[in-house]
Curated annotation (Swiss-Prot):
Pfam family, one: KOW
Source species taxonomy: Bacteria, Pseudomonadati, Pseudomonadota, Alphaproteobacteria, Hyphomicrobiales
NCBIfam families named in the record: rplX_bact (TIGR01079)
GO molecular function terms listed in the Swiss-Prot or TrEMBL record: rRNA binding; structural constituent of ribosome
Example of a GO biological process term: translation
Database matches in SMART domains: KOW
Annotated protein name in UniProt: Large ribosomal subunit protein uL24
Self-association and partners: Part of the 50S ribosomal subunit.
Keywords, alphabetical: Methylation, Ribonucleoprotein, Ribosomal protein, RNA-binding, rRNA-binding
Sequence similarity: Belongs to the universal ribosomal protein uL24 family.
GO CC annotation terms, alphabetical: ribonucleoprotein complex; ribosome
Post-translational modification: A methylated and unmethylated form are thought to exist.
Amino acid sequence: MAAKIRKGDKVIVLSGRDKGRTGEVFEVRPDAGKALVRGINVVKRHQKQTQTQEGGIISKEAPIDLSNIAIVGKDGKPTRVGFKILADGKKVRVAKRSGAEIDG
């Protein structure tokens, strides 16, 4: 299946405690169907001390399910993603709401 959400996309959270917040995807895990979004779904983790890293409680982003996020269109509203094949044979992502091409 083609990737509808990719690294670098600006997304909005559709459900959960961060509903309505936007952020940038910095990692996608297609095998698990999850993504990491900067500043979204931040949890506290107890970090054991190592030689290079100090121990303590750290905050980090936890994966969020791909079904709970949507790409933000040019109008600032969430949009679904479709695919279109151009005349030169190149496959591009298209916003279903506006029909505009999605960069990336």
